[in-house]
């Protein structure tokens, strides 16, 4: 084009305008009380003593599938009761089978690992069940000593779990159930290779349970490798989209500051 000619866009700017869809809170209330659930009476008593009245949506919709031994993918936001959703049924199953080193829970952060173990202990109060928690920033030597004692549920962050396995202290092939909590964060934090290492080493794995706050297309390939014909549960507030974001056009005249206008 000749010098001095101004380039003009052929894109209609109105295409970028989008009105936000109002966020409507969807309240879910289970038709079942805690006492109605098909779980051990002692578990019910512990849940009621913790203040549980009814299961949350994710707990209500995943309970029977996990009890049946099916692989499961649950999409639900943090704070919806995901920890209880997997702990309640696996604890119920442990009551009848009761072998040590059967359940492996992998979480992205130390804080969540501690929280999961605390929840496990509160649900199993009065039971002869034990847990072990392995996270970074603690003594590896003490972790190795702890593994000499039985633990029905092992909880940990991927880095520490794989470290213990490579040192021969933790045998993944003993575990039959793998639980991946906050799967999206596990991937965001770069633990994909650690997860694949754990999965390949779990040669006797019978059930895989995966919970995530978001569902991304780039996760699907790995999810399909991890889960076999899974039950998929998406709760009412577990879908994250851009529909609630409003987009407008702000016209900036020649010589005007974009930042000044935006501010």
Positions of PLM-derived features:
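Conserved SAM-binding loop
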Residues: 36, 54-55, 105, 154, ...
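Conserved nucleic-acid-binding Ia/Ib motif block in the N-terminal RecA-like helicase ATPase lobe
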Residues: 44-45, 99-166, 174-177, 221, ...
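Well-ordered alpha-helical segments embedded in enzymatic catalytic cores
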Residues: 58-61, 89, 160, 194-197, ...
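Walker A/P-loop NTP-binding motif
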Residues: 63-72, 83-98, 119-123
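Conserved beta-strand position immediately N-terminal to the Walker
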Residues: 72-74, 103
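The conserved Walker
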Residues: 76-80
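Interdomain coupling/hinge region of P-loop NTPase helicase/AAA+ cores
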Residues: 104, 123, 132, 143, ...
